[in-house]
Structures are given as C-alpha cells and as structure tokens.
Amino acid sequence: TKVSDEQASPKAISVTDFDSSSWGREWAHVETDADYAAEKTVAEVRNLVGRVIGERWVDKFDFQLRGKADGKDVFEISDTGDGRISVRGNNGVSLASGLNYYLRHWCKVDYNPLFGSQLSMPESLPAVGRKILKYTNYEYRYALNFCTYSYTMAFWNWDDYEPFLDWAAMNGVNLMLDIVGQEEVLRETLTQYGYSDDEVREYLSGPGYYAWFYMQNLYSVGGPLPAAWFEQRVELGRRIHDRMQAYGVTPVIQGFGGQVPADFQEKNPTSVAASSGTWSGFDRPYMIKTYLTDADKAAGKEDYFQKVGDTFYKAQENVFGKVSNYYAVDPFHEGGTIPDGFDIVDIYRTVQRKMLDHDPAAVWVMQQWQWGIDETKLSGLADKGQALVLDLQSDLRSQASPMENQGVPWVWNMLHNFGGRMGLDGVPEVISQDITKAYNSSGYMRGIGITPEAIDNSPIVYELLFDMTWEQDPVDYRSWTQEYAERRYGGTDGTIEKAWDILLDTAYKHTDGEYYQGASESIINARPSDNTIGSASTWGHSDIDYDKRQFEKAAALFEQAYDSYKDSAGFRYDYVDVMRQVLANSFQEYQPLAGQAYKSGDLETFRTLSSRMLDIIKAQDKLLSSSDDFLVGAWIDDARTMLDGADDWTAD
C-alpha cells in the first residue's frame, strides 16, 4: 500500500502574507531601527565565525561597523592589542570578507562548503602587524545563474543554503539571484485570472527544470508540484532573505515580462496573448501583448499586460515584502519568436515601465547571452540607468559592446560548469588579468560576478574571481595559485607546487579558440557505440586541448602527496577530481580503438580493449564512491527529503 493511498487529500494551499509573518515583522524592525540592524549584523557575523572555525574563536574577533571609503565598500583589519583581531567594515559582507581575508592570509585557512574546507587553525591568532585596508571598485559582486538552481541547487534546504550564504558573504557577494518560493507569487497571480491551484501546479515546472521555466523557455515539465511545496518554499525563501538582510546581500527576484499559460486568452477572452515559439522542442509560455492598437481596442480587447503586471507585483510584495529593488526577467532568452503585431522596442519599454510603476527604484536585471541583448532592445528602455545587464561569459566571450554603446550598466561575469558536467576547467590567467583591464577601459562596467550553470567543480576559479573584488590591479595568477593551494591543503611543498604548475599549464590553461561551453565530459556516461563518441549529452563535448601525459604527471604528484595532506577535505576533493579526470581521459583514448577493432572483426584486440575499458569504469566507480561530493545518492536523497510530509510518489 502506498503512503499516498492512506493520506487524506492535501489541504488547500494557504500561505501567510509577509507582513503578518514573523519574518515580515523582523524585516520591518531591521529596516526601521538602525541600532538594532547594526547589532543584528554584528551578531550574525559572530555566528558565522562559530559555524566556520568554531565557537572558541568567536570572542577572539572584534567586529565593528564603519562607513564606506569614498562611497565604496571597505574592510580593515588590525590588532586590538590584547591578542584579538579587529575587523571593521561598512556592512556584514565587508565584515565577513575582512574575516575571510585574515583567515586566508594569516591562518592559512580555506572555507569552502561546496568543495571541501581546510580549517586547521593555529594555537593562537597571529598578529596582523599593521592595519590592512581593502576597498572595492565594484558596486556589484553578483552570484548565480538560473541554471544553478536546477543543476546544483534544485533540492537544497536551509542546511545547504546557510553555509553557502556564509561562503558568499565571506567572498564579497552583495547581489544574488534568488528564486526560492517564487512559485507562490505565480500562484497568487494566476488564480486571479481563472486558474485553479491544480492548474497552476500543472503549469509550473519541477525544480530540476526551474532554470528554463523561469527563463521563459518551457513550462509544465517535471511537475506537478505537490501542494505542500508552496508554503514550505516560501518559508525557506523568507529565511534566506532574513540572513541576506543581515549580511547586506540584495536578492534579485522575479520581474514580470508578460509570460502566461497557453490558454490564458481562453480564460480571459478580452486579453491578447500569443505564442513566443519553441525552445529545443519545448513550447514556450505565451506572452501578453504589451500595448494595444486601435484595432485591438475596437475589437473590445483590454490591456491585460498592465492588469496582470499589477497583480504580479502586488503578489510579489504580499509574499516577500519589499525585499529588493532588483528584478530579473528575460522575455526572449535563447531565442523565442516575437509574435505578430508585437514590437520588441515597446516590449522592453513596457516591461521596465511596469517595474518602475510598482517600484520607482527598480533595477531590471537582464542576461546577455548569445547576443540576446542588442542595441535595439536597450534603446527601448524607459530608464537605462535603472537596468543592469549580466554579461554572462565575459571570461571567454564578452558581449558587452551593446551596453557600452547604449550607456547601460553591466557586470563582468564568469560562466562556468556548463550543464554541471564533471571536468576540470577554467581560465585563471584570464580572470587574474582581464577583470581590472575591462573595468579600467569601460564606461559602464559596475561589477563582477559568477554565473555558473552549476557549481560542481574547479573551486580555484571561484575563489580567484572573488579575490579580485578587493584588487585594483591584475595579479600574478601563478603565485596566487601556490598560496591558494597552501591554505586549501594546510601546507605545501615542492610536490604540490609542481603539481599545480602542471595543472595551470594543462586543464586550467587558456587557449585561443577554446570550446566555449566548458569542460569536456566523460564519455563513460555516453550511450555505447562502435563509432568515436564525441559527447555524452546534447550540448556536451569531449575535446581535450591539453597534453594528457603532462596532466597525468600532476596526478602522480597528487598521489605522492596524499599521505601528507589527506587530512584536508580540500585536498581530498581535489585528489579525487584529478584522478577522476585521468580515468575519463584514458577511457576516451581506448573507446575509438575498441570501436575500430569491433568493426574490423579483430575480436582479440576488441576483447583486450573492452576489458581495459571495463576496468576503468570499475576504478572510476570505486574512486568516486570514496567521496560524498561525487555520489549520485546524495542528489537523490536530497530530492527525497527536501519536502516535509511528501508522499511516496512525490519523494520518488
């Protein structure tokens, strides 16, 4: 008997409005009482210390808030004279960043909840010696991509978000995409236009497909969502916002771009809505027309864009309060069809005007990807100064020229870990050099950020990018990497130094013309074939543009260093990842040879090669099973346990 067979029908979906919730009251208290807000910020940073390095160290730091430095975020570190360390900053993010700077450079500690930490503290806190003051030129330090919410974060709960928010604050992040609980905003909107809760649940996609649902590429995939989802995810979203508020991180929440279910016009006959095309074989949502012609008005049509937009923003405030002035929406992400009679310039103007009607301080956050944001679209903006374009892949394929030409603020981003594919990849040299060069030559670059499709490998590039927050000049990435390895592993020696030099010259080396969608993937995961396999997934590839034999030398050095550094979770993670890459590379060499032997009838060679390939698969499985970070079971367990009270069908 199924658990669901024995359960009563789910109760109607009911979510307490924000102002009536404990989160709403707390938010208002912080916003209206500066002294209380300051006390809470310092208290939360002290709590962060306890979570990261242990309670015994909390009172060893003296945190104080100070003003900005010439309008810029800043932190300073100094000795107190009584064995403690003073950290001063203009907000929680600056305080956490100052703490992180001290831990990395004086204690040789590296905190990374995603990729393993090295938290071995000295017996007592080393003295700073002189006051250190660091400021940033970048108004925005942005994090996340819609894809990250599906490829890595689909089933996260508070136990995942809390350490991630700590890490983000310690790395200077002050603007972060946040879609947790946004389904309730859509439910409260659509139920005002003829939709039942069940119909809304059918329209929404499941969390594994949220990326493409919220980017307006598809709908009704991977659902329906259980009724309990809405209240629980709103509660999580409010909890996330509470911590963000204390740190000084601004969430980027959803804006309204006119997207509605395909049957919207049937339910609302005086509206004008049309298909926006397909994406990779999936139907996109329909789009409400942003303006009415005289012919539309003569036919009795009404301006539903204004109506639904008002409802949407009212629902957004009802669910999450006035939590942010930053709104993300991309009406035509990765293509899409502009319906007949719709004007692209008017769409962009009207979408922004509706935001500004609701929130005069609104900033429209858009994604520049595949040249989807062009000068024509930007020319339609009602206020270019209240837009912010994320140039998603500035590290390898910058597309910032439309923003520069139109005078629209933009953010330099690193797009990484395409598709969540497991492969060592990244361009430290580019990150260390090009960010400051771009800023110095730009009139409108306002920040830096990470826009990874997933966050599942190559921690070096994330740490380096956010370290650039506090630098005004390019850095020597090779020296930086050696310091990074020392704190990540709790020490260093010639073996580690040589291993990382090789990694920088192989997997982490920038090559002109490099395949721009990230790391090669392991063809162990591909469907078997007697032809040469080029990828394991639709958008993947298996190109290796470095010397595999050189890379294997780095792996041998990691093996040599294992006993010295195995107590570091950071080292163990990197060890498994490097060895995994060696096995994936080796399998790739055998596969085409085995296919050729099979097709030519050389069964002896085929059996020899296929036996080696099977041995590699077994070795890969044994290696990856040694680390929780590489287990598919962890992903499955997260999916099954993310929702309280889920029946067995939902959990599976």
Question: Model regions: which residues?
Answer:
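Short amphipathic alpha-helical segments and their helix-coil junctions
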Residues: 79-83, 438, 553-570
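A glycine-rich, aromatic-flanked flexible loop/lid motif
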Residues: 319-324, 562-567, 582-587
